[in-house]
Amino acid sequence: MSQSLFSQPLNVINVGIAMFSDDLKKQHVEVTQLDWTPPGQGNMQVVQALDNIADSPLADKIAAANQQALERIIQSHPVLIGFDQAINVVPGMTAKTILHAGPPITWEKMCGAMKGAVTGALVFEGLAKDLDEAAELAASGEITFSPCHEHDCVGSMAGVTSASMFMHIVKNKTYGNIAYTNMSEQMAKILRMGANDQSVIDRLNWMRDVQGPILRDAMKIIGEIDLRLMLAQALHMGDECHNRNNAGTTLLIQALTPGIIQAGYSVEQQREVFEFVASSDYFSGPTWMAMCKAAMDAAHGIEYSTVVTTMARNGVEFGLRVSGLPGQWFTGPAQQVIGPMFAGYKPEDSGLDIGDSAITETYGIGGFAMATAPAIVALVGGTVEEAIDFSRQMREITLGENPNVTIPLLGFMGVPSAIDITRVGSSGILPVINTAIAHKDAGVGMIGAGIVHPPFACFEKAILGWCERYGV
């Protein structure tokens, strides 16, 4: 038997350490490398914690809590109800408050892109006359820095949000909670990517003085826009609604247009708004973020639940929040995003993973729904087959599917919903996120896009924190 085995061509499946497959390849043996990691990534403390959770007397309560979290995500019905300045609507906003993406961070520890966005926002708000003065003010202790997520908000990339910026107002019709996010500056050299020169400030001024009031008054006429229905339509039209938004932006401006033309503004001002929207498909990107935030907040704070309700990054740390552990962040080091760079830039120019936009993946779209948007690989890299596989694979770490938001290419499977920290811990499969890449230095902006995963440390800490909280 052994003689016949080794006298014929071999096709070896290698599980685990890649060095074995590398050695076989050098000997011209066909090898399939199976990407596998042991439960808890081999950390026996985490393995024991996972076993304790699975065998806990609380098992029935955990299952019921997780089912409730999944149902709240699925049953959430977010609608856009208006636009207004942050100072008027965002809980806790003051003239000297700056909200930012990701878990809490101090000025001293912020990455270049976030510092660039903060100084630009302080100049925009008239709190500093130039960027140097803004940096001094930011370091003085006079400015309150706080995560967007702790103010019912989300913020794209650096996520910097200040008092006079106009915000989406999204209401969860099912549960009544409201979520906010600022408006898209469109793409490349923009504040949220760390750019802060006069052209950036001028654009922010126009958004505050022209676009914001027009959209605010348009929504007073329209009343509400059904975002869950629009999201489902956009996915069926080839978006994944994180980094590809061609369909979503078309649908959103289509819904806003009747209100815009009835709101009483000049034809010239209306033209400026329409041209601005047409300049990039990203106009609806923040809209989906606020929609997802409204749904995920409804699932937060359910006792015993192991469902992830927040994934967010500040360019230094990646942070998770878990439904059954309200008020806590579980952090690990932000990772490098892997993907195509714009001409003239190289990977070492890039900052680390940043932004609250991973709320889209937390809900089940973006990287989780890449099978709806095969064309996204032109932006973030990889192959169409890999994009489709990501959507299948994410089902292994989630509790169910959302029948309201489906993937045609996978037989209209609902998007994978409700990431479970225990499933991530047991399988070693990490959530997939597609995202933009900001330059590591302030003042530059977007330089690429790609794929990234959270560090396992976030899930490790969350699993151990859950066990500590519930005495398991």
From Swiss-Prot:
Pfam families: AllG (PF06545). InterPro entries: AllG-like, OXTCase_su_AllG_h-dom. Belongs to the AllG family. This is Uncharacterized protein YahG.
